[in-house]
């Protein structure tokens, strides 16, 4: 198989629950061409966006918000959310980097992990509902199209957030009994500045060209959120691992949705922003 096709296929095997199959050869190719992350995000965004579009025509808003969340985790799995809970436990641990890393890697779910996981899910739900509430006032009958755009932008932003935090991060020290790099370290090693830039340009293009400012501003905000998370990971652990990269996915998605909701609110109050939806 062509190396680009293998990397693209492996992106779905690695980042989604879609049963395309994955191998170590495929993972190696994906890490060499890790700019496929936002490409996979774009395909996921089209799929989840279509569900949001159709659902907005059928279901009450609160039901659709829950359905969208369920769709996201059905297609992407809970691995990244598991990273959020691990990061929460690590953040809440007291003491040195070593003690915090121990809490980070502990398989037992603690209070910090539960709290962080709940906050992320509540923020996810609340951001979708805010877009629905503000969007009906700005777009009226075009609200289904706004929901499609929002979920597309959110998934592209989520995957580019992973690429962003990996590109600027350094891996945590490898345990002495671990001879080979884990997936987090492989992701960081693959996220070269060149690969980051290719992914960033692709994501900016597909978010801005069809959707204008409603696409670009949330996308950029999600990338910034990844850098903020990286700063906190350095402060608590002295580096970055796969849990942090997975958390960047969740935080990036939510950041994009929140910024869309805030921008809609500002547009409604000021009337000063121009919107482009396809």
UniProtKB/Swiss-Prot annotation:
Pathway: Cofactor biosynthesis; adenosylcobalamin biosynthesis; adenosylcobalamin from cob(II)yrinate a,c-diamide: step 7/7. It is an enzyme of class 2 (transferase). It catalyses: alpha-ribazole + adenosylcob(III)inamide-GDP = adenosylcob(III)alamin + GMP + H(+); alpha-ribazole 5'-phosphate + adenosylcob(III)inamide-GDP = adenosylcob(III)alamin 5'-phosphate + GMP + H(+). Its cofactor is Mg(2+). The gene is cobS. GO terms for molecular function: adenosylcobinamide-GDP ribazoletransferase activity; cobalamin 5'-phosphate synthase activity. It comes from Methanosarcina acetivorans (strain ATCC 35395 / DSM 2834 / JCM 12185 / C2A). Its EC number is 2.7.8.26. GO terms for cellular component: plasma membrane. It is found in: Cell membrane. The chain crosses the membrane at residues 4-24, 39-59, 63-83, 108-128, 136-156, 197-217, 254-274. Belongs to the CobS family. Disulfide bonds: none annotated. Joins adenosylcobinamide-GDP and alpha-ribazole to generate adenosylcobalamin (Ado-cobalamin). Also synthesizes adenosylcobalamin 5'-phosphate from adenosylcobinamide-GDP and alpha-ribazole 5'-phosphate. GO terms for biological process: cobalamin biosynthetic process. Keywords: Cell membrane, Cobalamin biosynthesis, Magnesium, Membrane, Transferase, Transmembrane, Transmembrane helix. It comes from the Archaea. This is Adenosylcobinamide-GDP ribazoletransferase. It is a multi-pass membrane protein. The keyword DNA-binding does not apply.
